[in-house]
């Protein structure tokens, strides 16, 4: 009888202990998520400046052999790692536009010339302007396929209106 009473009391104490630890651990875990009050703004010589004006010296111990990985990406290209240190991220890559070759310059000039001749044909509605504009549009490179189709549609719209003799 005494043994059963002691066993039941130990079980109740254990159950109470388990519930209190789970409640406490979930309360602690909920604090880590959500918006952060302090966000790093700049890093200079291992000193991190936060947006509220405070500073913190950061160091990664030499004996820390845990692999380093990115935990969070902040504004201003600042990375926070799993060990609590901060670094600037990699600089963004900018693709420089390729220098235009003579061939591409000539193709662009043909496109511009075709646009000018189509504009002139829209104003005059003459047969000679139509021939010049149609020839120029036909000579436009296939690389400007969409613009070429637009120019051809403009010519067709003028032809629907009729030519002036």
Curated annotation (Swiss-Prot):
GO cellular component terms attached to this protein's record: extracellular space
Gene Ontology molecular functions: complement binding
Name of a matching Pfam family: efb-c
Gene3D superfamilies per the UniProt record, alphabetical: Sbi, C3 binding domain IV
InterPro entries named among the record's database cross-references: Efb_C_sf (IPR036233), Extracellular_fibrinogen-bd_C (IPR021033), Sbi_C3_db_domIV (IPR041909)
Record keyword Signal present: yes
Keyword annotations: Secreted, Signal, Virulence
UniProt signal peptide: 1-29
Places the protein is found: Secreted
Highest taxon of source: Bacteria
Assembly mode: Interacts with host fibrinogen alpha chain/FGA. Interacts with host complement protein C3.
Function: Extracellular fibrinogen-binding protein that plays an important role in virulence. By interacting with the alpha chain of fibrinogen and its derivative fibrin, enhances a non-functional interaction between fibrinogen and platelets and is responsible for repression of fibrinogen-dependent platelet aggregation. In addition, assembles a fibrinogen protective shield around the bacteria which results in impaired phagocytic clearance by the host.
Stated name of the protein: Fibrinogen-binding protein
Protein species of origin: Staphylococcus aureus (strain MSSA476)
Chain's gene name: fib
């Amino acid at each position: 009888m005494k043994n059963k009473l002691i066993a039941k009391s130990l079980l109740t104490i254990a159950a109470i202990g388990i519930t209190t630890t789970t409640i406490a651990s979930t309360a602690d875990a909920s604090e880590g998520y959500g918006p952060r009050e302090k966000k790093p703004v700049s890093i200079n010589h291992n000193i991190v400046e936060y947006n509220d004006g405070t500073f913190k010296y950061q160091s990664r111990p030499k004996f820390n052999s845990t692999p380093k990985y990115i935990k969070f990406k902040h504004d201003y290209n600042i990375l926070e790692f799993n060990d609590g240190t901060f670094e600037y991220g990699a600089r963004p890559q900018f693709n420089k536009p390729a220098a235009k070759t003579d061939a591409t310059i000539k193709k662009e000039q043909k496109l511009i010339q075709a646009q000018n001749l189509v504009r002139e044909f829209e104003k005059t509605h003459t047969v000679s302007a139509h021939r010049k504009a149609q020839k120029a549009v036909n000579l436009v490179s296939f690389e400007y396929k969409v613009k070429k189709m637009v120019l051809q549609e403009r010519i067709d719209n003028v032809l629907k209106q009729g030519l002036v003799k």
